[in-house]
């Protein structure tokens, strides 16, 4: 359920802002309505947090010796603050980057000078001061033969059609008569031999900095703790900046101005009494009212332990219903489990998930830790997958004739591998379409409950009629035309449903105004019939993805079966595990794409759920 909220406005003395905010944070139940704000302190906190992220990224691959979770760590016998460690890590990395650039430059100079042998550029510069300019030049042999006679050259080497020579000139710079393909050597500041020495020194310095950076790997715990503190400081600063100060009056005796600061937020109704006691204790003034539809009210979901199993998936997706919308967590959990089982469609895969989840639960209990809802969700999904896989008699893609009789007796003949393939597929598609009809009708029934006192409820009854008619149309097209004919009653239900939906879907004040609003969007209204057909048809994806996964499992078994008859049995086991593991991962991705979509798109559209909610994040100690 969505927890009801109250909008609260808090008023405090301007001189008591920080103390009041600390008390409000200790209370820990008010979701503060933040404003767009900026300050120098906030910018510094964000910059420090960015440096912490950079520092963790720099040392995360280093070998961690002793991860310390305090605010201080010891490296090389010296205790330093975590913030100082961050600065040292960033500075060390900056020095490494600078050294890497110098090493790259040194290597580039060596590569250019290597064909010219060892020489001392200082001698060349000394001769240039005496008026003798030596210019190392590389050019093609043909261009070398065509050099003018007035150019004095000394040929050093001929290799690969290239000539390396030295031009002797009485002034600096390349002569204008030199061919276009001639390239002069850029002289380094020292000799190649000295470059080698410099390169070795730079690499040693870089290795030293690398070891120093590796030593900071034990700071990761401290830096993460520092990030948590920074996050709390950022939140406090943003709330502080969101408080609006107003000058109320001025004392005649002292001339001091009385300033009042106020901030707004949202509070669960169940905490209003506790907030009132806190306000009385802290001498606050406050106003507590019901939120308006235009207010950005946060959404807090509170469900029982069973429905709360879906929370890991909802947190992963980041989907939150709006405060004024409906919570479908229970229906989401129920149908997501069914869709999961049909997409996996393998009792063996379900057994693996069940055993892994049970192992996680047992391990958590042995450690006296709280069992994560993710393990319970895995147990629920694995159990449903085992049930559906047993009904269709699919155990790791093994042909039904090799399945033990005790397991084969569990199967439902019409939808299992014992039936004819064509008929089995039609029956399974029929099951998927029926689930789709049930799923979408349930969505409209939820809306019926919310709009029962309004004529708009007739639009939902019209949608139900269209869904029923389109369900038969889909069965006629996909499953069996003779068994599911398109009678006049079916067509009439679709038309009647469309008329009811068209007239009352925009009902607010009067039927006439509702029809007028529908006429403005008549094209979208007509396309709505197609959308209903597409939504029912969309549930065929459950059968299609499950069929594909079963085919992959069977193919993997057929490919590896011959290997078990000879000495390649070990290779067969490896390929079997790899193939089924890959299929398992692909099935998980299919669930995320298809199983989640049917809940968050098709079902949500029929409920009128837009997932535009703001997660309830109270201002509290972290």
From Swiss-Prot:
GO BP term, example: vacuolar acidification
Localization terms from the record: Cell membrane
Gene Ontology MF terms in the entry: ATPase binding; proton-transporting ATPase activity, rotational mechanism
Key words of the record: Cell membrane, Hydrogen ion transport, Ion transport, Membrane, Transmembrane, Transmembrane helix, Transport
Transmembrane segments: 306-326, 328-348, 373-393, 428-448, 459-479, 485-505, 532-552, 562-582
Residues making up the signal peptide according to the UniProt record: none
Record-level GO cellular component terms: plasma membrane; proton-transporting V-type ATPase, V0 domain; vacuolar proton-transporting V-type ATPase complex
Membrane topology: Multi-pass membrane protein
Keyword match Nucleotide-binding: no
Record family assignment: Belongs to the V-ATPase 116 kDa subunit family.
NCBIfam families: PRK05771.2-2
Reported function: Produces ATP from ADP in the presence of a proton gradient across the membrane.
Annotated protein name in UniProt: V-type ATP synthase subunit I 1
Protein encoded by which gene: atpI1
């Amino acid at each position: 359920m969505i927890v009801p909220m109250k909008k609260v406005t808090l008023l405090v003395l301007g001189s008591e802002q920080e103390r009041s905010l600390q008390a409000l944070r200790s209370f820990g139940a008010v979701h503060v309505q933040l404003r767009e704000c900026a300050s120098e302190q906030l910018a510094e906190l964000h910059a420090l947090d960015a440096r912490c992220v950079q520092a963790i990224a720099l040392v995360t691959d280093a070998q961690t010796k002793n991860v310390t979770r305090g605010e201080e760590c010891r490296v090389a016998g010296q205790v330093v603050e975590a913030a100082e460690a961050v600065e040292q890590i960033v500075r060390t990395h900056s020095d490494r980057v600078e050294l890497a650039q110098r090493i790259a430059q040194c290597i580039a100079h060596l590569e250019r000078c290597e064909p010219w042998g060892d020489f001392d550029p200082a001698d060349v510069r000394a001769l240039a001061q005496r008026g003798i300019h030596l210019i190392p030049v590389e050019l093609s042999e043909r261009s070398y033969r065509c050099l003018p006679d007035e150019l004095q050259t000394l040929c050093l080497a001929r290799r690969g059609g290239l000539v390396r020579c030295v031009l002797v000139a009485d002034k600096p710079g390349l002569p204008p008569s030199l061919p276009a393909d001639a390239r002069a050597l850029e002289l380094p500041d020292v000799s190649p031999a000295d470059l080698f020495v410099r390169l070795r020194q730079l690499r040693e310095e870089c290795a030293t900095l690398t070891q120093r950076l590796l030593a900071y790997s034990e700071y990761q715990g401290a830096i993460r703790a520092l990030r948590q503190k920074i996050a709390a400081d950022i939140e406090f600063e943003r709330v502080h900046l969101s408080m609006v100060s107003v000058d109320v009056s001025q004392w005649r005796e002292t001339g001091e101005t009385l300033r009042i600061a106020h901030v707004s937020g949202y509070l669960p109704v169940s905490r209003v009494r506790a907030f009132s006691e806190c306000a009385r204790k802290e001498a606050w003034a406050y106003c507590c009212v019901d939120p308006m539809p235009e207010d950005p009210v946060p959404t807090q979901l509170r469900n029982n332990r069973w429905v709360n199993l879906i929370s890991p998936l909802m947190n992963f997706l980041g989907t939150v219903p709006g405060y004024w919308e409906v919570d479908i967590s229970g229906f989401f959990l129920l149908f997501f489990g069914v869709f999961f089982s049909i997409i996996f469609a393998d009792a063996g895969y379900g057994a693996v998930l069940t055993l892994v989840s049970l192992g996680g639960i047992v391990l958590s209990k042995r450690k006296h830790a709280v069992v994560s809802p993710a393990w319970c969700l895995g147990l629920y999904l694995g159990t449903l997958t085992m049930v559906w896989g047993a009904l269709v008699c699919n155990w790791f893609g093994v042909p039904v004739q090799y399945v033990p009789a005790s397991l084969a007796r569990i199967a439902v003949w019409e939808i299992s591998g014992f039936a004819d393939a064509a008929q089995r597929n039609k029956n399974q598609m029929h099951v998927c379409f029926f689930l789709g009809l049930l799923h979408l009708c349930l969505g409209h029934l939820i809306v019926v409950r919310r709009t029962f006192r309004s004529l708009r409820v007739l639009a939902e009854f019209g949608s139900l009629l269209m869904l029923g008619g389109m369900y038969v149309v889909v069965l006629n097209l996909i499953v069996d035309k003779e068994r599911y004919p398109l009678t006049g009653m079916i067509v009439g239900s679709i038309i009647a449903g469309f008329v009811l939906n068209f007239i009352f879907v925009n009902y607010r004040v009067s039927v006439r105004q509702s029809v007028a609003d529908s006429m403005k969007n008549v094209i979208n209204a007509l396309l709505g019939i197609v959308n209903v057909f597409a939504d029912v048809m969309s549930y065929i994806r459950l059968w299609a993805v499950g069929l594909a996964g079963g085919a992959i499992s069977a193919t993997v078994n057929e490919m590896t079966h011959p290997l078990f008859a000879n000495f390649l049995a070990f290779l067969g086991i490896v390929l079997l595990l790899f193939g089924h593991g890959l299929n398992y991962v692909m099935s998980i991705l299919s669930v995320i794409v298809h199983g989640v979509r049917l809940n968050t798109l098709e079902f949500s559209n029929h409920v009128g759920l837009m997932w535009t909610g703001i997660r309830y994040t109270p201002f509290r100690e972290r």
